[in-house]
Swiss-Prot record:
Entry annotated with the keyword Hydrolase: yes
Pfam families in UniProt: Amidohydro_1
Gene: pyrC
Catalysed reactions, semicolon-separated: (S)-dihydroorotate + H2O = N-carbamoyl-L-aspartate + H(+)
PANTHER family: DIHYDROOROTASE
Protein known as: Dihydroorotase
Residues annotated as binding Zn(2+) 1: H14, H16, K100, D248
NCBIfam families registered for this protein in UniProt: pyrC_dimer (TIGR00856)
Length: 348
């Protein structure tokens, strides 16, 4: 078993960098490992057009560490009022790479999201025409649907219809959490892919709920039962190019997580590739990590692969108990625990 693993530099195809003072921390954590990242647009107010995307992009670039070549790939936030013209303008910008469908109320800062899928059909048609991928938070939000069933329900009620109606539209089913989602993506046409988080590969709902409620495991879509975790691992290590890395690293200040009504999100960017390495090692599949982390994503998006490399070494180190997060602190996933892989260096 090798104690050293060298990969083409990976990208993160789903990350939350937040805004304001927090960028000084989140951008550096992402840039430590990733060449590029698809940056989620669910700010307050959200990133709804190319001008807002450019302003946010400039704030991210200003927070890059010295000499970093990290590239933020910007995303529009779809609303009921997003027009086909806004899609075309965003595509022409060269820096907006996708548009994100949040069902209204599904997750953090999604109140401005789409209330009915049909309301964005004109935008989706324009996206298909110009070659802009649709990123989907795949959960229904009706109160009568159990939180553990909302992903499967979204597939049956909405996603199948979107894929059938727009056969040339690239669709990324983001942060999939169920065997149902993995099967849907496998069986869908080649224009449908999915991201998988490290925390959904490493953990299931027992880790969050057994022996006490652990708020730093709470995320949306929520962790599912262990059989779904195993199905996600099967997909990630399969070598199927439809599945690729997306951390959904989503920081919240400690007081917003450790609360009577805590926020959803796990902060993993500080050690993302190390966490994925642990998951792949569980399946004796470290040879599949480069495809998942570095190749499948850019290939799906039609972007060039990175050419520089990173190196991981098998070395135990202790995750920090907390990290700075603007004016506050954030408790990262695995805080205070031992990690088994460590990012060593970048190679030209």
């Amino acid at each position: 078993m090798s104690d050293r693993l060298t990969l083409l530099r990976p990208d993160d195809w789903h990350i939350h960098l937040r805004d304001g003072a927090a960028l000084a921390n989140t951008v550096g954590d992402a840039a430590r490992t990733f060449g590029r990242a698809i940056v989620m647009p669910n700010l307050v107010p959200p990133v709804r057009n190319a001008a807002e995307a450019d302003a946010y992009r400039q704030r991210i670039l200003a927070a890059r560490p010295a000499a970093s070549r990290f590239e933020p790939l910007m995303v529009l936030y779809l609303t009921d009022r997003t027009s086909a013209e806004e899609i075309r303008t965003a595509k022409a910008s060269g820096f907006v790479h996708a548009a994100k469908l949040y069902p209204a109320g599904a997750t953090t800062n999604s109140d401005s999201g789409v209330t009915r899928i049909d309301n964005v059909f004109a935008a989706l048609e324009a996206m298909a025409e110009v070659g802009m991928p649709l990123l989907v938070h795949g959960e229904v939000t009706r109160a009568e649907v159990d939180v553990f069933d909302r992903e499967k329900q979204f597939i049956d009620e909405h996603l199948r219809r979107v894929v059938e109606r727009f056969p040339t539209l690239k669709v990324v089913f983001e942060h999939i959490t169920t065997g149902d989602a993995a099967q849907f993506v496998r069986e869908a046409p080649a224009n449908v892919g999915a991201t998988i988080t490290a925390h959904h590969l490493l953990y299931n709902r027992n880790h969050m709920l057994v022996g006490g409620i652990r708020p730093h495991f709470y995320c949306l879509p929520i962790l599912k039962r262990n059989t779904h975790q195993e199905a996600l691992l099967d997909a990630a290590v399969s070598g199927n190019p439809k599945f690729f890395l997306g951390t959904d690293s989503a920081p919240h200040a400690r007081h917003a997580k450790e609360a009577a009504c805590g926020c959803a999100g796990c902060y993993t960017a500080y050690a993302a590739i190390e966490l994925y390495a642990e998951a792949f090692e569980q399946r004796n599949a470290l040879d599949k990590l480069e495809g998942f982390a570095s190749l499948h994503g850019p290939d799906f998006y039609g972007l060039p692969r990175n050419t520089d490399r990173i190196t991981l070494v098998r070395e135990q180190w202790q995750a920090p108990a907390s990290l700075p997060f603007g004016d506050f602190d954030v408790v990262p996933l695995r805080a205070g625990e031992t990690l088994r892989w460590k990012l060593l260096e970048a190679e030209a």
